[in-house]
């Protein structure tokens, strides 16, 4: 990993490391050093390393939103670990300003029976397909794709797409 800023302004990028520390009752029970620039991909290896070193299996894991990802939630569930981990957009989503953004697709009305959203202009946005992608760590993520059939000539098209 490299630092994002060149503090010396000489064109040399400095190496950076991501330190993870696990605690229980305010005592450090383990730490790891990673080259990953984000916390998301350090969660599972750090948890496994600490459990291995301590020779135990955790029942609970608490982490901040930076660790929230589908892969991490899936890992916790499969390993029967109760996780208290906010998802990354939680703080943004609870704000009134976020909920007032009518063209944000997360605020659109969803009809589970029809499996379609309704855009702010009243047009149906039906389910089209499911796409599976492999992330850098090899985890398969599944996405549902929805597509409006009647966007031609809509004056708000740029706000939706």
Where are these regions (language model features)?
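Anion-binding and metal-coordination hotspots
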Residues: 1-161
């Amino acid at each position: 990993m490299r630092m994002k800023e060149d503090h010396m302004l000489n064109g040399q990028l400095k190496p950076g490391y991501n330190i993870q520390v696990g605690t229980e009752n305010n005592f450090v029970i383990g730490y790891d050093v990673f080259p990953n620039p984000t916390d998301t991909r350090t969660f599972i290896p750090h948890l496994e390393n600490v459990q291995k070193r301590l020779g135990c299996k955790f029942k609970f894991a608490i982490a901040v939103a930076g660790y929230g990802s589908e892969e991490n939630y899936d890992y916790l569930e499969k390993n029967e670990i109760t996780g208290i981990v906010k998802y990354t957009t939680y703080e943004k989503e609870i704000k009134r300003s976020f909920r007032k953004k009518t063209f944000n697709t997360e605020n659109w009305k969803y009809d589970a029976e029809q499996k379609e959203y309704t855009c702010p202009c009243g047009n149906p946005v039906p389910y089209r397909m499911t796409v599976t992608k492999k992330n850098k760590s090899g985890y398969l993520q599944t996405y549902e794709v929805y597509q409006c059939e009647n966007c031609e000539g809509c004056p708000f098209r740029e706000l939706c797409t």
